């Protein structure tokens, strides 16, 4: 389970190279946004048959602009993405669902970027004050993203999983993803060291502003 790649092909490849014996890859959105390697990321998704939903940044790309209250960094990244993305890959993003209800090994799974109640913008942090709301859902597992903070929490009969980010982790510098053994219902969050400096150097050559790398310095 992965999320919030944000055009970081270096992070995505690091995570994929760590996977062994995996049958499915699920993504909770934000394939695009911030960093410039969006075509490489989308092509990798296609090659690996990743099951994914849209995130808010993916929707900004589809809309051609971010909302007025968003930061200049986000608005600039939308303009950069519009110039970079291929026609085929734009169609791929446009055709992703806002949410998915699927069944895996007789378990009902909801995949959504933000929350079941606000698909794009609500953030379910580890200290979310209203976790009891999840008890009302007729599912076994909710997979979400958006916060860039990993979470594995069981509320009643519902397991809530946020894999963290393999593109822009915000709690520490290590990339984050989650393994789910669907036979035993065991979830494990994993963290990986990656080549931050190499990524920053290459992204800067593509015109990414320095402010988008501050997050990596802030959490060292």
Question: Residue ranges of each PLM-predicted region?
Answer:
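Active-site-proximal beta-strand elements of phosphoester/diester hydrolases
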Residues: 1-6, 108-115, 160-164
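Core catalytic region of metal-dependent phosphoesterases/phosphodiesterases
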Residues: 2-94
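Acidic, His/Gly-rich catalytic cores of divalent-metal-dependent hydrolytic chemistry
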Residues: 154-220
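Short acidic-hydrophobic surface loop/beta-edge motif
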Residues: 98-106, 153-155
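Anionic-ligand binding region
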Residues: 124-161
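Hydrophobic/aromatic beta-strand patches that form the interior of the parallel beta-sheet core
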Residues: 26, 51-53, 110-112, 143, ...
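Active-site environment of divalent metal-dependent phosphoester hydrolases
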Residues: 6-11, 33-36, 59-62, 118-119, ...
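Active-site-proximal segments of metal-dependent phosphoesterases and phosphodiesterases across multiple
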Residues: 69-76, 106-137
């Amino acid at each position: 389970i992965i999320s919030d790649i944000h055009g970081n092909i270096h992070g995505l490849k690091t995570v994929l190279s760590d996977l062994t014996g995996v049958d499915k890859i699920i993504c909770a959105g934000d394939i695009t946004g911030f960093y410039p390697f969006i075509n490489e990321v989308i092509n990798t998704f296609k090659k690996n048959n990743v099951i994914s939903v849209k995130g808010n940044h993916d929707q900004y790309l589809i809309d051609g602009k971010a909302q007025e209250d968003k930061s200049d960094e986000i608005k600039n990244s939308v303009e950069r993405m519009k110039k970079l993305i291929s026609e085929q890959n734009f169609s791929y993003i446009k055709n992703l669902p806002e949410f998915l209800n699927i069944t895996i090994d007789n378990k009902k799974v909801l995949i959504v970027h933000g929350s079941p109640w606000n698909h794009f913008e609500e953030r379910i942090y580890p200290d979310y004050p209203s976790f009891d709301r999840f008890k009302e859902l007729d599912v076994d597992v909710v997979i979400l993203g958006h916060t860039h903070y990993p979470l594995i929490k069981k509320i009643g009969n519902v397991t809530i999983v946020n894999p963290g980010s393999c593109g822009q982790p915000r709690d520490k510098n290590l990339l984050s993803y989650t393994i789910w053994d669907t036979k035993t219902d065991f979830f494990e969050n994993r963290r990986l060291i990656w080549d931050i400096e190499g990524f920053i150097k290459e992204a800067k050559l593509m015109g990414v502003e320095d402010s988008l790398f501050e997050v990596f310095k802030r959490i060292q």
